[in-house]
Design a protein with these regions (language model features):
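Residue-level signature of catalytic and energy-coupling elements of molecular machines
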Residues: 10, 44, 68
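Long amphipathic alpha-helical segments used for membrane anchoring, targeting, substrate engagement
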Residues: 1-30, 78-98
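N-terminal intrinsically disordered, cationic/polar leader segments
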Residues: 29-50
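Short amphipathic alpha-helical "recognition" segments used for binding
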Residues: 18-20, 58, 69
Length: 98
C-alpha cells in the first residue's frame, strides 16, 4: 500500500471514529438503583436525577446518597462499555484514547 492510500485510509478511520464518538456523546444513558434513577449524556454529564419519594423516609438520607452514587457509577460503566464497543475496533484495545 502506498503512502497516499495509507493516508486516505487513516483519514477515513479518523472520520468514522469521530462520528462514533459524536453518536455516543449525544446519547442519553439511564441508570438506576432501587428508588433512584438518573440520566446522563455520553459525555458523562449528569442531566437528571429522579427519586421515588413514596419510598423515602426522612431517616434514609444516607441510603439515598449511596443509591445516587451507585446509579451514577452504573451509568458511567454503561457509557464506558458502549464507547469501547464502538471505538475499540479503532483503538485496538488501547485504553484511555476516548
Amino acid at each position: 500500500m502506498n503512502m497516499q492510500a495509507m493516508l486516505k485510509q487513516a483519514q477515513k478511520i479518523q472520520k468514522e471514529m469521530m462520528s462514533a464518538k459524536e453518536e455516543i456523546d449525544n446519547k442519553i444513558f439511564e441508570g438506576s438503583s432501587s428508588f433512584v434513577k438518573i440520566k446522563m449524556k455520553g459525555t458523562k454529564e449528569l442531566v437528571e436525577v429522579l427519586i421515588e419519594k413514596e419510598n423515602l423516609d426522612a431517616e434514609e438520607t444516607e441510603m439515598l446518597q449511596d443509591m445516587i452514587i451507585i446509579a451514577i457509577n452504573n451509568t458511567i460503566k454503561d457509557i464506558d462499555k458502549e464507547t469501547e464497543n464502538k471505538l475499540g475496533k479503532y483503538t485496538n484495545g488501547m485504553p484511555g484514547l476516548f
